[in-house]
Structure formats: structure tokens, C-alpha cells
Amino acid sequence: MSKKMKNIAQSEVLTLREQISYQEGQVVSKTLTQNQAVSITLFSFAKGEEISTHESGGDAFVTCLDGIGKITIDGVEYLLHEGESIVMPAGHPHAVCLLYTSDAADDK
């Protein structure tokens, strides 16, 4: 059987937050799986960094793993706190921005 997930340990308990690091002034991404049915990607945002407004062909499920993020969907802003999730529907303009993280690198 071929491995469907990549860049992440299998058969091991893990914390998603520890699977990606913050880098000052950057949005960092790490793809875990991608195919015609689903794409799972971890993102880390330096404070104030964002993915600007765009639309996508599929729904996007976002979970905040650390800090507070601002999600904009159809011009409406939502604050997402650690542990909270939101679905950004396909075909609707949306953006993601980090407002605050508890990571010490955030204060550099």
C-alpha cells in the first residue's frame, strides 16, 4: 500500500502545532496530503502576515492551532481563537491573517 500522507510521522501520536515552525516575516506551508478529493496543509504565520483575499474551487476548513487569527469571508471578519475552526466556502472570497501567537518568536 502506498503512503498517502507525507511530511508527517505515521502510527505516532503527535501535536499538529509542533509539526511546523514560525519564521519571522513569512507564511510557511507544509503539505501533508493532496489529491483530487482533499488537500491538507499546515500553515504558520508570522505576526501580521496574511494570505490575501482569493477564491478557491473547494471548501477550506481552517483550525487555529495557536494564538488568534482573523478570517475574512465575503468581507465579513471572524476572529478564530486557539482550538476554534471555520469553513471558508468554495467560490467565496476569503483571506487569513495572524493577529497574535503565543510563540516567543512572535515578539522578535
Label the predicted regions:
Residues V76-P89:
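Short acidic-glycine-tyrosine-enriched beta hairpin
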Residues V38, K47, G57, V76, ...:
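A generic "binding-loop/recognition-motif" signal
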Residues Y100-K108:
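Conserved small/polar residues in nucleotide/adenosyl-binding loops
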Residues S44, G57-K70:
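Short, conserved beta-strand element in jelly-roll/cupin
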Residues I68-K70, E77, P93:
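Structural motif
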Residues M1-A37:
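A short, N-terminal "cap"/entry segment at the start of jelly-roll beta-barrel domains
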Residues I51-T53, I71-T72, M88, H94-L99:
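Short beta-strand His + acidic residue motifs that chelate non-heme Fe in jelly-roll/DSBH
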Residues Q26, T41-E55:
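Conserved short histidine dyad/triad with adjacent acidic residue
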